[in-house]
């Protein structure tokens, strides 16, 4: 299963939950921000040298470090294969 850290800029995907290694407080905060099962997320841009990426979800944009984004599991967005076209 893909994770959010693997989503290329411009691509969309549906959130399918969190990996088992995520700390409970991090998962709780991500859910508060809109990273909830079924929501569609889009990678807006990435910072150079492996820095944080900016993701749009629930009408807002958030920067997440790669090690946090790696815990957000993804499936294809409805009508989308998750790949930029």
Regions found by a protein language model. Give the residues of each.
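C-terminal structural segments of small proteins and small subunits
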Residues: 11, 47-50, 54-85
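Short, acidic/hydrophobic/Gly-rich beta-strand patch recurrent on exposed beta strands
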Residues: 16, 34, 54-57
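Short alpha-helix capping/helix-loop boundary micro-motifs
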Residues: 23-29
């Amino acid at each position: 299963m893909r994770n959010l850290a693997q989503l290329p800029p411009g691509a969309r995907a549906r959130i399918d939950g969190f990996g088992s290694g995520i700390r409970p407080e991090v998962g709780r905060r991500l859910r508060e921000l809109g990273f909830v099962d079924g929501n569609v997320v889009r990678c807006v841009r990435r910072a150079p040298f492996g820095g944080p990426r900016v993701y749009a979800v629930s009408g807002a944009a958030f920067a997440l470090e790669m090690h946090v984004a790696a815990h957000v599991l993804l499936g294809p967005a409805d009508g989308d294969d998750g790949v930029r076209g």
